[in-house]
From Swiss-Prot:
Organism, scientific name: Picrophilus torridus (strain ATCC 700027 / DSM 9790 / JCM 10055 / NBRC 100828 / KAW 2/3)
GO molecular function per UniProt: ATP binding; formate-tetrahydrofolate ligase activity
SUPFAM superfamilies registered for this protein in UniProt: P-loop containing nucleoside triphosphate hydrolases
Any single GO BP term: tetrahydrofolate interconversion
Catalytic activity, as annotated: (6S)-5,6,7,8-tetrahydrofolate + formate + ATP = (6R)-10-formyltetrahydrofolate + ADP + phosphate
Record protein name field: Formate--tetrahydrofolate ligase
Classification via HAMAP family: FTHFS
NCBIfam families: PRK13505.1
Pathway terms, separated by semicolons: One-carbon metabolism; tetrahydrofolate interconversion
Entry's EC annotation: 6.3.4.3
Amino acid sequence: MKNISEIINIPEDYYDLYGRYIAKVSLNVLDYLKNKRYGKLILVTAMTPTPAGEGKTTTAIGLGNALKLLGKNAGIAIREPSLGPCFGVKGGATGGGKSTVEPSNKINLMFTGDFPAVSAAHNLLSAVINNHMYHGNELKLDPKNIVFPRTIDMDDRSLRSIIVGSGDRSTGVMMNDKYVITAASEVMAILALSRNYNELKQRLGNIMIGYNLNKAPIFARDLKVHGAMASLLVDALRPNIAQTSEHVPAIIHTGPFGNIAHGTSSILGDIIGLKMFDYLVTEAGFGSDLGFEKFIDIVLRLSDFKLSAVVLVATVRAMRYHGGGRINEPDVNAVLRGSENLMWHVQNIKKFGFNPVVAINRHSNDTDAEINAISNILTKNGVEFSISDAYSDGGHGALDLAGKVLKSISDYNPRYIYGINDDPEEKISKIAMNVYNANSVEFSHDAVKTMKLIKDDFSDLYVCMAKTQSSISDNAKLINVPEGFTVKINGININSGSGFIIPLLGNIMTMPGLPRRPASENIDIDDYGNITGLQ
């Protein structure tokens, strides 16, 4: 690794060092960069993933490295890892092989403290809510109708439903409560969407915490706590910069999940990156049905920058899986069947007005016959593609991909799935039927009740669907390209601070659980404090 000062092309007055290899950028760097034009934004998405993921982050990093090798002024912008997946199923989120961001262990394990700051600000509000009710409840908050949860950056299913204040009066007001993982916290979404401190504080104040006894919504600003919450996030709003394995600057900031949140790194990081670099590569969580849709329908609407190219990551193993084969066993016929999922994502991206470049992320047990089968399908359908060896060869393995992405860059005008003035129920239905392939949408009794409140007070909010990442549908068991199904809306969260409602589809959980053999079993330190086993 190089000292971070060697690769950041901005004066030292505009960033603070966190050791030799990490820096936090000050927001006033935008004054320094104000006369710079935006560069070209390249978004990396994927086909419907297997549990281990398809290498979207690895591809984004490799693409950034390749652009540098081609002599381009390039950077990347990705999300910060959550401890939940690090210790759970998926492992770390810093790429892999020869396409990583460094120092990877530091980045994976709490980094510069942004996640703990989000958790602290979030839980401060939770503490103040209960404290307000304990000390007389001037706002007449209904303890049975508090909708703001608590948060922790860990997978822990035992916290999905809890009771607080269950002792004597000294333990506070007894009520039902729950935890969400920090990546699904509304405060995390607010941090990712805020462009300055004033907007941050305003959004925090707009968080709806619940209802009073007269059924009127109550907000964080009513408790006069949003300023204190913002004080905990002063440094967290500042984007972090590290570096790739080939010394490309990497903006790594905020970490909302793509399935239960909006799934992209911060808008502020994108703005700064697009001013610093001619080409900025970013990524959106999970498949094009999740993070990509939310990037178009939410992030681009809130921003003044444009998206210039889209990369769609595909793998042979994912096509084996969607074709009914075994993930690690070569099977050309399964790949041919599973390619329907890939082609569905190609067409889905085109619905939004973009022509993607498919990056086939090659794995060691992919056979030539399988690669050729996919290549023939893409060629037959006129889809630009490249075989990416970013994992094994770093930037050199993504040079062909980089060249094709550069050729694909265009002044695209996105086509949004819904209008901001559409009825909230119509917004949800348009996403379900136009993006998820559903025949119809069914709202539960609880969802219908919440929808009435939304129509009265929050009809102008965006929609951020929470659903499984393992299927285009709301049912993780329906692989490949399911048809003829009904999307079930089992509840709706109102995140008025972040500016969207979150319909809860199928059996989606905002607090994951650990698997039978969590990744934490493999992580250790040696006698010198070196971390091992973090993948």
